[in-house]
Each structure stands twice: as C-alpha cells, then as structure tokens.
Amino acid sequence: MVLDGFAAHFDAYLENIVREGKSEHTVAAYRRDLEELFALLAQMPSEAEGGVPQGLSRRDFTAALRRLSQRGLNARTLARKLSSWRQYCVWLVERGLLHTDPTADIKPPKQPERVPKALPQEWLNRMLDLPVDGGDPLAVRDHALFELMYGSGLRVSEIHGLNADDVYLDEAWVHVTGKGRKQRQVPLTGKSVEALKNYLPLRQTASDGKALFTGRNGTRLSQRQIQKRLAQWAAQNGDGRHVSPHMMRHSYAGHLLQASRDIRAVQELLGHSSLSTTQIYTKLDFDHIARLYDEAHPRAKRQDE
C-alpha cells in the first residue's frame, strides 16, 4: 500500500527532529499533524500501486486540506498543518525515500490579517500596581510572573522554560530560549526586578531546583497553569475582560512601538526571525495615532459634534 511506504519512516523522522533540538511541544505538534494526515490519506483511494510512497500525489494532499477545511479549521491552522506535512516530505526527499515533494507547489490557505489585541496601558498599570499580599507566596510569585510577562514581552512557552539562573537581577536582564531554541537577552523593567527579588526567597524548589516559576510542590509551572493563573487574576481584580499571555505580549509590543518607533529593536526584543511578523504591530501603532488625531486636531472633528 502506498500509504504504508509513506508512513514507514514516521518514527525515524520524529527521532531526527528530537536530535535537532526541537522542543517537546513542537515534536508533539508534528506528531499530531502527521498522524492526522495519515488517517486522512487512508480514507482516500490512491491511483498508484505498490508499497512505495512515490504514488502519493499533490491531489491527495489538497484533498486532505479540503477535508480539514470542511471540518471548520481556520486558514492559520491549515497553513501550519501543511507546513508540518511539507517538512516531512522534504526530509524524505533529502534521504532518497521520495522522488519529489508532492506538497511543493501547494499554496497555504490565505490568512486574513489579524490585528493583535492589546490591553489598555492604563488598565495594565492599575492592575500591576494592585497591593500584593506578601504573606502569600503564590500571590508574590504571580505578581513577579505577570510583571515579567508584560515588562519583557515573553511568550508563555518562554516563561515556562525559564530557569532561576536565566535571570540576572543586578544587570536587569533575562536570558530567553525562544522558538527554534534561539537565544536572546531581554531587559527587565525596574518593576520586574523588584517583583522577582520579592519572589525568589519564597520560591519552592524540587530536587533539581532549576525552574524559575514553580508550584507548591516545587515543580515547574506548566504553560496551562500560567494561562490559568493569569485569567484568574484578571477575573478577580479586573473588569471582567479576558486576558491571556498572548495579549500581554501583544500589549508589550504595541506599547513599546508607540513609545520608541524602532521596529527593528522591537523585532529583536520579541525574538521574531522575520520583520514582517513584527510589522503587524504597526497597525496597533497607527490606531493609537489615529485616535490622538481625532481627539486633538481641530479639523478632525465632525461638524455635528
């Protein structure tokens, strides 16, 4: 069966990307995407015969994408899945296990431009300036976590992966391992340094003692736990609005761009490999400028106001 030949090297491929240093989260995502692809291809009649993967065609992969689209998956998710499939096909071609990449000329679904949601700067300042119960280690930890999240614009995966020795309080910077294991240094705000100094003496540690943010049992906080703590904090102290780590990162980027106008510096701080990824925040900046214009310029007001 054609599919058997195509899927036969699946485990070897996963072992290879583990050796390349991909994170557990990335490897798990590749596994899910490829297992889903194999299941979809198994439901399709193939024109080829024999036990080699050569018979799979572009048509098979576009049909798989179409079925996922019919299930309601959005363009962004479909594009990510196609990327996972393509990387597997390229790996097979490079090793002589596949003559050509059947996904090579498949264009990913066009994604609508999404402007990130940023939280109001005044709201964030008010929330982060709320009194912290110094007798509650979890409250002190969460305050340091949220200050770092907004003050340095880290991804939730990056915060999850931080170790205590990644933080340099005297120099006011943090060593971050980002996507693709890329390393960068990000400055710490004065508020973050103060919050971390309050938290570190109270930090619970397990046997290895490495993780920066830990739970009561001393083990590293999971990404889901970080998301949950942030949502609970916002719900209990805010005005009912939904808050996520991604929104905190978007707020950091948008507010920094408004203040600095230096998109290259913001790109470096965010750990974006491509400037085009950072450029979406210029839309946030334009919205801010447009509001100021409407409020301040005498010719911007409508006649009926």
Swiss-Prot record:
SUPFAM superfamilies per record: DNA breaking-rejoining enzymes
Location(s), subcellular: Cytoplasm
Active site location: 155, 179, 246, 249, 272, 281 (o-(3'-phospho-dna)-tyrosine intermediate)
Keyword annotations: Cell cycle, Cell division, Chromosome partition, Cytoplasm, DNA integration, DNA recombination, DNA-binding
GO cellular component, one term: cytoplasm
Pfam families on file: Phage_int_SAM_1, Phage_integrase
Residue ranges of every copy of the Core-binding (CB) domain listed in the record: 1-93
Domain of life assignment: Bacteria
GO biological processes: cell division; chromosome segregation; DNA transposition
Single GO MF descriptor: DNA binding
Similarity comment: family membership: Belongs to the 'phage' integrase family. XerC subfamily.
Subunit-level organization: Forms a cyclic heterotetrameric complex composed of two molecules of XerC and two molecules of XerD.
Role: Site-specific tyrosine recombinase, which acts by catalyzing the cutting and rejoining of the recombining DNA molecules. The XerC-XerD complex is essential to convert dimers of the bacterial chromosome into monomers to permit their segregation at cell division. It also contributes to the segregational stability of plasmids.
PANTHER family, alphabetized: PHAGE INTEGRASE-RELATED, TYROSINE RECOMBINASE XERC
Protein name: Tyrosine recombinase XerC
Organism: Neisseria meningitidis serogroup C (strain 053442)
Highest classification ranks of the organism: Bacteria, Pseudomonadati, Pseudomonadota, Betaproteobacteria, Neisseriales
